[in-house]
UniProtKB/Swiss-Prot annotation:
Pfam families: KARI_C, KARI_N. This is Ketol-acid reductoisomerase (NADP(+)). InterPro entries: 6-PGluconate_DH-like_C_sf, KARI, KARI_C, KARI_N, KARI_prok, NAD(P)-bd_dom_sf. Involved in the biosynthesis of branched-chain amino acids (BCAA). Catalyzes an alkyl-migration followed by a ketol-acid reduction of (S)-2-acetolactate (S2AL) to yield (R)-2,3-dihydroxy-isovalerate. In the isomerase reaction, S2AL is rearranged via a Mg-dependent methyl migration to produce 3-hydroxy-3-methyl-2-ketobutyrate (HMKB). In the reductase reaction, this 2-ketoacid undergoes a metal-dependent reduction by NADPH to yield (R)-2,3-dihydroxy-isovalerate. The gene is ilvC. Mg(2+) 1 binds at residues 190, 194. The lineage of its organism: Bacteria, Bacillati, Bacillota, Bacilli, Bacillales. It comes from Lysinibacillus sphaericus (strain C3-41). Mg(2+) 2 binds at residues 190, 226, 230. Pathway: Amino-acid biosynthesis; L-isoleucine biosynthesis; L-isoleucine from 2-oxobutanoate: step 2/4; Amino-acid biosynthesis; L-valine biosynthesis; L-valine from pyruvate: step 2/4.
Amino acid sequence: MATMYYEQNINEEVLKGKKIAIIGYGSQGHAHALNLKESGFDVVVGVRPGGSFDAAKADGVDVKTVAEAAQEADVIQILLPDERQKAVYEAEIAPHLEAGKALMFAHGFNIHFGQITPPADVDVFLVAPKGPGHLVRRQFQEGAGVPGLFAIHQDATGQAKDLALAYGKGIGAARGGLLETTFKEETETDLFGEQAVLCGGATQLVKAGFETLVEAGYQPELAYFETLHELKLIVDLMFEGGMATMRYSVSDTAEWGDYVAGPRIIDESVKARMKDVLTDIQDGTFARRWIQENENGRPEYTKFKEAGANHQIEEVGAKLREMMPFINEGKEKVVREVATSAKN
């Protein structure tokens, strides 16, 4: 059974008196920085001059260049996109990693796949809320918290675990619970979930269903409603109470169809290919391909992105969403929450 840690189990004093550098001020960066600041920790944000620099300054956070923040901080949390971390680390962070400092991440990609190799005399750990930054911020402001993961890669000082837990408490994650894992487990399961189910699996399933109905002569608008629009209703039910709650909530006809048709779509051959995807993640094949893609200027990434944007389902969906203002209101609410949370 997984070990969970909550606020009452954690002493944050180990992190008090230390300066924490948040590198990056995007969705996660602004949430971590502001939550830590309001929890009484000494925070500095390290970003390049420009929009994020000005935004952090306007929020009342101490802002420096990445190199300056890394130099003066005791704990350095890198909240940049995976593909940018190595270059920024080597140029602006590594020169200032003195013995006894701590290097943090919110995802284990660059450590696990050897893109970043910190010196042996620094602590290395991750703390990863399981939700987007605007939700991490909103839950914190409401007195709740998004649950998170933490893992230790190096414990040079003997305090790495205590520091990770204190950091998790500072951003509000310990209110929801912090689950202990490893860099390997966090990285591989996160990538697998994205590729096989949450992003890759879901988008291909929706697209195939939409195309099947349209090619059979049904109106694209109805196909969109039945394969994409209503997906949120089903996922919300599963999110709230698991598959059993979803099946309880839908009609008996829908539930019966789930049982008899579902295994015809997602059968053992699909599971076998999922295992192939997992193997590519575990042996580094996916990581090497993604690293090479970035080094080459992202030609395949751009091609895939353009093809997806030009699919008929996007055109149909855009027109239908214009007829449903409540959807745009929800989208605008998220944007407002991000802006408001950064101001408060």
